[in-house]
Amino acid sequence: MKILITGRPGVGKTTLIKKLSCLLQNAGGFYTEEIRESGKRIGFKIVTLDGEEGILARTDLPFPYRVGKYYVNLKDLEEIGVRSLEGALREKNLIIVDEIGKMELLSSKFREVVEKIFDSEKDVIATIKKSSDPFVERIKSRDGVVVFELNEKNRDSLLKEILYVLKFNRGENNDTGAD
């Protein structure tokens, strides 16, 4: 099953992904976290589910690529993020990707591994930007992809809903609640 989580920035997509990755077994991949100094966001780091970390983007390190005020570090994205996705594709049952967004899409290696992941039989939970980007739209419109929009009203219930849908699809819970 392929699950995409979308929503406005700051609504809690990464928090939801982190909770799901803790609750679900045999998962691999990565999520992103803010880097803050003096209460201000100055960048993002990549954190793999097995604990490896790298810099995705910062405002104060002049990497060659830029998205808004952030300089994007494709080296760490590819050596840490993409490598974790490739490993998860080989060895895990569930692949976590946070996120399929503007910064990550600068990397052709990232786009390639995302295509492989969505072509695979593996379960996937990914966050994805709201966008008219052709790559993003192609991923969202694939057969078998379920898109959940996270917002303030459903952020407490969506965790349970995603767990239920994933487990039901795996055949782990065939009780629909209907008598």
From Swiss-Prot:
Residues where ATP binds: 7-14, 94-101
Top-rank lineage group of the source organism: Bacteria
EC number: 3.6.1.15
Keywords, sorted A to Z: ATP-binding, Hydrolase, Nucleotide-binding
A GO molecular-function annotation: ATP binding
Listed Pfam families: NTPase_1
Stored SUPFAM superfamilies: P-loop containing nucleoside triphosphate hydrolases
The reaction(s) this protein catalyses: a ribonucleoside 5'-triphosphate + H2O = a ribonucleoside 5'-diphosphate + phosphate + H(+)
InterPro entries given in the database record: AAA+_ATPase, Nuc-triphosphatase_THEP1, P-loop_NTPase
HAMAP family: NTPase_1 (MF_00796)
Role, per record: Has nucleotide phosphatase activity towards ATP, GTP, CTP, TTP and UTP. May hydrolyze nucleoside diphosphates with lower efficiency.
Family: Belongs to the THEP1 NTPase family.
NCBIfam families, A to Z: PRK13695.1 (NF010248)
Official protein name in the record: Nucleoside-triphosphatase THEP1
Species this chain originates from: Thermotoga petrophila (strain ATCC BAA-488 / DSM 13995 / JCM 10881 / RKU-1)
